[in-house]
Curated annotation (Swiss-Prot):
List of catalytic residues: 161 (proton acceptor), 266 (proton donor)
Name of the protein: Tagaturonate/fructuronate epimerase
Thermal behaviour (record text): Optimum temperature is 60 degrees Celsius.
Top-rank taxon: Bacteria
Protein family membership: Belongs to the UxaE family.
Keyword Translocase: no
EC number(s) recorded for this UniProt protein: 5.1.2.7
Organism: Thermotoga maritima (strain ATCC 43589 / DSM 3109 / JCM 10099 / NBRC 100826 / MSB8)
Pfam families: UxaE
Binding sites annotated in the UniProt record for a divalent metal cation: 162, 308, 341
UniProt keyword annotations, A-Z: Isomerase, Metal-binding
Catalytic reaction equation(s): keto-D-tagaturonate = keto-D-fructuronate
């Protein structure tokens, strides 16, 4: 009834997102789109308390309040519809869909809504926010508007990813994030850079702080029939790599506990040069438990290469053997999931990963959704794509420094020589994928490129949503077997 009245009287100027329509307490809420952008419309006798609106019109006895999509109005929506507030994933199998543009969540909803995976629709790292100029509030609000637009009400999480500093942790907690991924990589030691003498000296320093040798030496474990025991050498090496990192994680955990009572806590130890051995995995878990750190997810450094935006590079059979060991350790200790970072496009490993973990997993993606967005640009606005491509070439060497990739610029095609209809095919080239993947910040800092990129995606919204949704669903289907 309300939508019909609205369309009859205002339909020419507004496109209604019908899936967004909700009713509560004699009020109707829905999203519309006009030439200037998206607008929240609230229909009822009077506006809800706290709602700000720029226009009020009546039709057939119904008052329509036209509102900006801002934080204050979203807070009003959250009061009426608590499912628009993020919640914990807990030990449910979960999937993170980072959105660097802030407009991609409707596609992510479509990919995940009928799956058995709990969605983390709001997920960005500190690094991503710095490069895109966004805040924790922007990330959570943008995702929530997308959830509202699609009429999704089954619950979602919000992950403050790769947090290193206490101030970033606190600000994300105060914005309502429900998951926090701690990156202690600045405190992880690289064993290959230490001589035997240096290793022994630094281990003695640790022992002067705490006699962990008395806790671990001689401790034995059996994992899938393999005997694992702490001896002086492997305990020394485990402590050298992880002891300080775990102390940092503990400090961050205590700060977070003072801010919010209930949250998912992910510990990321994947930023090491060498893969996490079963014994190192055991040491990390034992130390976290000993300190009272309650963690939901643990991200390990697996064998092989986990580069951004492309499939796994490595020995699949060896990975399968290792993930079975790690999954068994997780089952042995109980109470946490194994998390896969740089999870975008790792299609070849998903079946083995999901099977070994028995559904006790979390997978993170982010860059792949941005790649699909730029791919849509290549389909519908070839000249803009060529400008973006040239921008990525100009900034690649600087932007690549903080990413683990192997892209070779000598192997990327000259975009001027590629026909318009062949541009989308460039996204099959791993060098092009990584070129575009890591330079998003430089592209989005170019005001002209950013404005035209967003305008093009808005003008081709359904193609954009369906392209991203199809790609993310490919991940989901392989994880669900």
């Amino acid at each position: 009834m309300v939508l019909k009245v609205f369309k009859d009287h205002f339909g020419r100027g507004y496109e209604v997102y019908e899936k967004s329509y909700r009713e509560k307490d004699s009020l109707s809420f829905f999203l519309t789109k006009e030439e200037e952008g998206k607008i929240l419309v609230v229909a009822g006798e009077k506006a809800p308390e706290g709602l700000s609106f720029f226009k009020k019109q009546r039709a057939e006895g119904v008052s329509f309040f036209f509102c900006e999509r801002n934080h204050e109005n979203l807070e009003v929506l959250r009061k009426y519809f608590p499912d628009l507030k993020p919640v914990r994933a807990g030990l449910r199998a979960s999937f993170g869909t980072g959105d660097r543009l802030g407009i991609t969540t409707p596609a992510h909803v479509r990919a995940l809504k009928d799956s058995g995976l709990f969605p983390i629709f709001a997920q960005q790292s500190v690094r991503e926010n710095e490069r895109t100029g966004r805040t924790w509030r922007d990330v959570l609000d943008d995702a929530t508007w997308g959830v509202f637009q699609e009429g999704y009400s089954e619950g979602f999480g919000a992950d403050a990813d790769h947090v290193k500093r206490p101030e970033d942790l606190v600000s994300a907690a105060r914005e309502g994030f429900t998951m926090f991924t701690i990156d202690p990589s600045d405190h992880v030691r690289n064993l290959s850079k230490l001589t035997e003498k240096e290793r022994n000296e630094k281990f003695e320093e640790i022992l002067r702080k705490e006699r962990i040798d008395r806790i671990y030496l001689g401790k034995k474990y059996s994992v899938l029939g393999e005997k694992i025991e702490f001896d002086e050498k492997n305990l020394r090496d485990a402590a050298l790599v992880y002891y300080d990192a775990i102390a940092h994680v503990d400090m961050m955990y205590q700060i977070l506990k003072d801010e919010t009572p209930d949250f998912d806590f992910e510990v990321s130890v994947d930023e090491t040069e060498t893969p996490t051995s079963p014994l190192f995995h055991i040491f990390v878990v034992e130390e976290l438990r000993r300190r009272g750190v309650e963690f939901t997810n643990l991200a390990l450094r697996f064998i092989g290469e986990w580069e951004k935006g492309i499939d796994y590079k490595g020995d699949l059979a060896q990975f399968e053997r290792e993930i079975k060991m790690h999954a068994e350790i997780a089952r042995m200790f109980e109470g946490y999931k194994i998390s896969l970072h740089s999870g975008s496009d790792k299609f070849s490993v998903y079946p083995a990963f999901a099977s070994a973990t028995g559904g006790l997993f979390h997978v993170k993606t982010a860059g792949t959704s941005y790649l699909e967005a730029v791919k849509v640009i290549s389909m519908v606005n070839p000249e803009l794509f060529r400008e973006i491509y040239r921008c990525t070439l100009d900034h690649f060497e600087e932007d690549r420094k903080s990413y683990h990739i192997s892209a070779d610029l000598s192997k990327v095609p000259e975009v001027e020589k590629v026909k318009d209809e062949d541009l989308p095919g460039l996204f099959e080239d791993i060098n092009v994928r990584q070129l575009i993947h890591v330079t998003y910040g430089s592209v989005l800092k170019d005001a002209s490129l950013k404005e035209r990129l967003f305008k093009t995606l808005e003008q081709n919204e359904e193609l954009f949503y369906e392209t991203v949704a199809k790609h993310i669903k490919r991940h989901v289907d392989l994880l669900e077997g």
